[in-house]
């Protein structure tokens, strides 16, 4: 492969990477903790919303609510990572990408 072909291939990969990054920013996943807490996050792991079931909001038991929120965030984060790995996987050639 000559240098010009390599450069063209690199530009093409960069363009595809940017397209996928934009797609991830516009794609959401949901993480849940039972039916009590739902966290919506985009493919970049940015939290977009948190929904709480009214019955889980108990001023006498804040710890349970905190645990449920942490669990829902962890679930959404795992799903966002899986989504990113799935979309970026072909470009990475099986390598683990930092931050994903």
Curated annotation (Swiss-Prot):
Location of the protein in the cell: Cytoplasm, Nucleoid
Domain of life per record: Bacteria
GO-annotated molecular function: DNA binding
Entry GO terms, CC: bacterial nucleoid; cytosol
InterPro entries tied to this protein: YbaB-like_sf (IPR036894), YbaB/EbfC (IPR004401)
Keyword DNA-binding set for record: yes
Function: Binds to DNA and alters its conformation. May be involved in regulation of gene expression, nucleoid organization and DNA protection.
NCBIfam families recorded: DNA_YbaB_EbfC (TIGR00103)
Subunit structure: Homodimer.
Protein name per UniProt: Nucleoid-associated protein RoseRS_1534
Organism: Roseiflexus sp. (strain RS-1)
